[in-house]
Curated annotation (Swiss-Prot):
Pfam families: CASP_dom (PF04535)
PANTHER family for the chain: CASP-LIKE PROTEIN 4A4, CASP-LIKE PROTEIN 4C1
Side of membrane Extracellular, spans: 50-61, 119-139
Subunit and partners: Homodimer and heterodimers.
Species lineage: Eukaryota, Viridiplantae, Streptophyta, Embryophyta, Tracheophyta
Protein known as: CASP-like protein 4C1
GO cellular component: plasma membrane
Transmembrane segment boundaries: 29-49, 62-82, 98-118, 140-160
Membrane topology: Multi-pass membrane protein
Segments on the Cytoplasmic face: 1-28, 83-97, 161-182
């Protein structure tokens, strides 16, 4: 038997399906970005922590502390993103989760960048002291710190996009294209 639903209702249902698929894709991208920031932050903290000579310098201690903090935050965000991908809902109420993510991404991204920049300046002078492997290990920690910042910055851009979608449409998913030909 033919369905009694109107073509407009069918088009609305199709648009809703596209909107959900776009939201799932964006949540999946967010999960990958959060996982990348976690991996880079943990690796940068590990390299900074195992370099005893570099830890005598305050910028490397700052790099270690900042990346450890970013790693803890990223672990929480990986769990929240996995929860969202698996269940389709956020841990916190939607508006609160979006503002939490956007604000903390900005703050922790800046902290990661500041720490990597401070340690990079110190690492640049390391070669003149004849540090050898300690200098190489410090350079790797700085590079991983910058990579961690890049991942947090990309996640901040994506969370900013989700927040803008929420403010514009009332949903964290991007608006679906209209089925109207006009």
């Amino acid at each position: 038997m033919p369905s009694s639903s109107s073509p407009a209702a069918a088009a609305a249902g199709e648009g809703s399906g596209r909107k959900k698929a776009a939201g799932r894709r964006l949540a999946g991208v967010m999960l990958l970005l959060r996982l990348a920031s976690l991996c880079f932050a943990v690796a940068a903290a590990a390299f900074a922590a195992t370099d005893g000579a570099a830890l005598r310098a305050a910028p490397f201690r700052f790099l270690l502390a900042a990346n450890a903090i970013v790693a803890v935050y990223s672990a929480f965000e990986v769990a929240a993103a996995a929860w969202e991908v698996a269940g389709g809902a956020t841990l916190l109420p939607e508006a609160m989760q979006l503002w939490f993510d956007f604000g903390h991404d900005q703050g922790f991204g800046y902290m990661a960048l500041a720490a990597a920049a401070a340690a990079a300046r110190e690492a640049a002078t390391c070669g003149s002291h004849g540090g050898g492997t300690a200098c190489v290990q410090g350079d790797i920690a700085v590079g991983l710190g910058f990579a961690g910042f890049a991942a947090v910055a990309a996640a901040a851009a994506a969370s900013g996009y989700r927040l803008a979608c929420f403010l514009a449409t009332g949903s964290r998913s991007p608006a679906s294209p209209s089925s109207s030909p006009y």
